[in-house]
Amino acid sequence: MKKYLLSASIVFLLASCAQPPAKIGRPSKSEPSTVSTDSPEGISSESAEIGIVPLTPKIKSFDWSVPMKPLVENMSQTKDLPNGSVLLVDTVKNNTNGLLQIEKATESLLHILSSNNTFFLISANQLAKAKTALGISKQDNLSSRSKAIALGRYLKAEYVLYTDVSDDIQSPVINMELMLVKTGEIIWADKTAMTLAP
């Protein structure tokens, strides 16, 4: 009887310590985890793809006639400068640290000179043909004085007017030089400060 009780208590003890068998089944499908390396935390990939578009620098606007008129009047009074002198007007050049309406500047200069009886201006058509003949691009603004003089000689001009805008874009200065085509000598030069258009 004691043996029976002892063996029954051992069986009972072992049964209470045994763990239930683990359930065998198909492993559950979990969503693959993805790590984004393209966009920073908190920003969607669409936002990152769009990016930030930089602002286009603003082109400064000037009333070109205000500084140019007194310069042209001063130039026309140059000693030994005969009326009707043939003049090649070089494109105004931008040597500032900003953007300028250079085409308007050149147009304004030509308009002022055409109303002045001192010079006979070489036409834009003549200038374009001469550039083609000399192998100079039509977009070339004759950035070097020597190139402007060479073109002036080809066109049989007596003078070349070289004009540029320099210094800081907030307070630029317009410079003019009248050069004698025959020698390349600068016979007149002047400059003046410019102001922003209202």
Swiss-Prot record:
S-diacylglycerol cysteine lipid modification positions: C17
PANTHER family xrefs: PENICILLIN-BINDING PROTEIN ACTIVATOR LPOB
Keywords of the record: Cell outer membrane, Cell shape, Lipoprotein, Membrane, Palmitate, Peptidoglycan synthesis, Signal
InterPro entries assigned: LpoB
Stretches the record annotates as Disordered: 23-44
Organism expressing this protein natively: Hamiltonella defensa subsp. Acyrthosiphon pisum (strain 5AT)
Membrane topology, record value: Lipid-anchor
Keyword Zinc included in the entry's annotation: no
Family to which the UniProt record says this protein belongs: Belongs to the LpoB family.
Functional note: Regulator of peptidoglycan synthesis that is essential for the function of penicillin-binding protein 1B (PBP1b).
Polar residues: bias regions: 30-44
Name of the protein: Penicillin-binding protein activator LpoB
Entry keyword annotation includes Membrane: yes
